[in-house]
Regions:
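Entry/capping segment at the start of metal-dependent catalytic domains
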Residues: 3, 16-17, 21-124, 299-305
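C-terminal solvent-exposed extensions
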Residues: 69-84, 91, 140, 287-381
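Extracytoplasmic
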Residues: 89-92, 110-115, 124-132, 143, ...
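Structured segments of extracytoplasmic/periplasmic soluble domains
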Residues: 97, 103, 135, 163-173, ...
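Second-shell loop/turn segments in exported
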Residues: 103-106, 146-154, 169-174, 228, ...
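Soluble non-cytosolic domains of exported or imported proteins
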Residues: 108-112, 142, 151-159, 177-181, ...
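Amphipathic, coiled-coil-like alpha-helical scaffolding segments used for oligomerization/assembly
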Residues: 150, 154-219, 271, 291-293, ...
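Flexible, polar/acidic helix-loop-strand segments at domain edges
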Residues: 188-276
Length: 381
């Protein structure tokens, strides 16, 4: 059995250390925020924050997170690599969480329906997005293995970031979380998003619209999608589109749709006026939870156009995963070789060829194989 599993004596994984106080953040913060704006709608609205705060002192902002840095685990070898490697300098990584909560309760006790990693090259302005499939079988950062979306439910953004760092050799300490009603309000505020809808998706968009209206306090008008092709979707329709999973591609296609909507929102935001962004921000801010504070927002204006999304993909890679019922965990996406997937991830995000994974990632990879092989082998026999 791999040594990173938690034993009865409480011994925990080796090769990791707690993240110390954030270093050299002042120069990087503004660019981090700008790329977040490029990535997620809500954050796009943050462009308007400066204007809002300049005109009134009565406006409340988003829920700013005071995170416990001691809970954000970063593998010790990774800390050294990001500080010393020339290839890794100039990058900043952020976690994006979409939670299935619509009443402002977005901090904890809800599973992250969407998990993304956004990596920005601060020298070139290039941004890459990776969806981590929510049912991926990973170490939840406490040496317990289950579907990765359980990390947010158990320990909020701190544990979810720690989970990503531990399994993927990353150094994430910033995040943005949004609820589904923020997506609805944001898309509506931007005037909709342009999406190419196929025949198979129409019925699911309409069914999910009905379920969202039934199960949440969102009171948008139900407008049925009736035609295929490239068309302007409103907020409710776009949120429903993001939730489709029962088509060819299942959750993998669902994650692709979510990235597609993010790109469409970023495109709309770039064409929007400051007044439109301000109005949209006021609509969604109560459903945004983030480490980005008011002071950092002041560097946003006039720089958004310098950043663009140049690549997007999913994790694990389609040729490096399997789907199977893993005991009490239920149906999971299994990275058949986590270490191999992490090697691919670092080449995709940072251009690092033949990346050498940390001992922690290798231990997690070995443990995942030990846990899942009996189930995967049974299927192949």
């Amino acid at each position: 059995m791999a040594t990173n599993a938690k034993h009865e004596n409480g011994e925990s994984t080796k090769g990791k250390k707690k993240m110390s106080a954030k270093k050299r953040r002042a120069k990087q913060r503004a660019r981090i925020i700008i790329f977040v704006v490029e990535l997620l709608v809500i954050v796009v609205m943050l462009v308007a924050v400066l204007k809002v705060f300049q005109t009134t002192e009565e406006v409340e902002g988003p829920q700013f997170a005071q995170i416990d840095e001691s809970q954000i685990v970063v593998n010790s070898e990774v800390v050294e690599k990001f500080e010393e490697s020339e290839e890794l300098k100039g990058y900043w990584n952020i976690a994006l969480f979409g939670v299935d909560a619509t009443d402002g309760q977005i901090r904890k006790n809800t599973r992250s329906d969407t998990i993304m990693i956004a990596s920005v090259n601060q020298d070139t302005g290039e941004i890459r997005l990776v969806s981590v499939y929510r049912d991926t079988y990973l170490n939840l950062s406490n040496d317990r293995y289950n579907k990765c979306n359980g990390a947010y439910s158990s320990g909020g953004a701190e544990q979810a970031m720690a989970m990503l760092n531990m399994n993927l050799d990353l150094n994430i300490t910033d995040f943005v979380t949004v609820g589904y009603d923020a997506v609805v309000d944001c898309v509506n505020g931007l005037g909709g998003v342009w999406i190419d809808v196929d025949k198979e998706e129409i019925k699911h968009i309409n069914n999910y619209q009905k379920s969202i209206l039934r199960d949440t306090d969102i009171d948008d008008e139900l407008i049925m999608v009736e035609e295929t092709g490239y068309q302007l979707l409103n907020g409710l329709q776009a949120a429903a589109y993001c939730r489709i999973r029962f088509t060819a591609g299942n959750d993998f296609k669902r994650a692709e749709r979510q990235r597609e909507v993010i790109q469409a929102m970023a495109d709309q935001a770039k064409q929007s006026s400051l007044s439109t962004l301000t109005d949209t921000f006021l609509q969604v801010m109560n459903n945004v939870y983030t480490t980005i504070d008011q002071k950092d927002l002041q560097d946003l204006l006039g720089q958004i156009a310098n950043y663009s999304i140049v690549g997007e993909d999913g994790f694990p890679q389609r040729d490096k995963l399997a789907t199977e019922n893993i005991g009490a965990c239920g149906s999971c996406v299994v990275p058949t070789d986590l270490a191999d997937n992490v090697v691919w991830l670092h080449e995709f995000l940072f251009g690092v060829e033949d990346y050498e994974v940390s001992s922690t990632v290798q231990e997690c990879s070995d443990q995942i194989k030990a846990d899942t092989s009996p189930y995967l082998n049974r299927r192949s026999n």
